[in-house]
């Protein structure tokens, strides 16, 4: 299986956080070019440190290992820390040409889907939005797509791994199904987040 991941960061609307502040958070997106399998995570900022953390996260979140990534030329992806992380994980990194975001069109189109299918829903807090994003991540990986000959990303992954089990990612860590949806209390607050972000895992 080709393991070329398209990665991007999308700012989310300003909403109330668990500590009561109103500010932006950032959606980190990784989509596999071949299967269209997607992984999402929300972080507090668009920084090299969070880009490095997300890169490490997707090495466990995909059922197959991501060996190549394509990013835009944002500062978080051109930072030395991110380059070193790619080298450490033996991930080949490429960036888009300057001023040509369409070069990373697959993830840009997915971001458009998020904008039209998720961000148009009225919510009052980041906690509520992250519940929607988690559910959307799960639903998208199970959605049949014409480009995949009527299969879903999840079905595509399963078939290819059945055909060649050597492609399986030994570091893959599926989430507990009970933890797929973040728990939101009556105030709209989530439980304590880890490293400033709430992950949106999908268990294929």
Indicate where each model-derived feature is located.
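Hydrophobic "anchor" residues on beta-strands that sit immediately upstream
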Residues: 4, 28, 68
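Short small-residue beta-strand/loop micro-motif enriched in glycine and branched aliphatics
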Residues: 37-41, 94-96
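Short catalytic-loop micro-motif centered on adjacent basic/acidic residues
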Residues: 41, 68-72
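An active-site-proximal beta-strand-loop segment
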Residues: 7-38
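RNase H-like two-metal-ion nuclease catalytic core shared by retroviral integrases
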Residues: 71-73, 77-86, 93-116, 127-134, ...
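Basic, flexible linker segments flanking DNA-binding modules
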Residues: 1-15, 84, 100-101, 155-163
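C-terminal domain-tail junction helix/linker
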Residues: 2-3, 89-91, 113-204
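Active-site beta-loop-alpha junctions of metal-dependent nucleic acid enzymes
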Residues: 23-24, 40-64
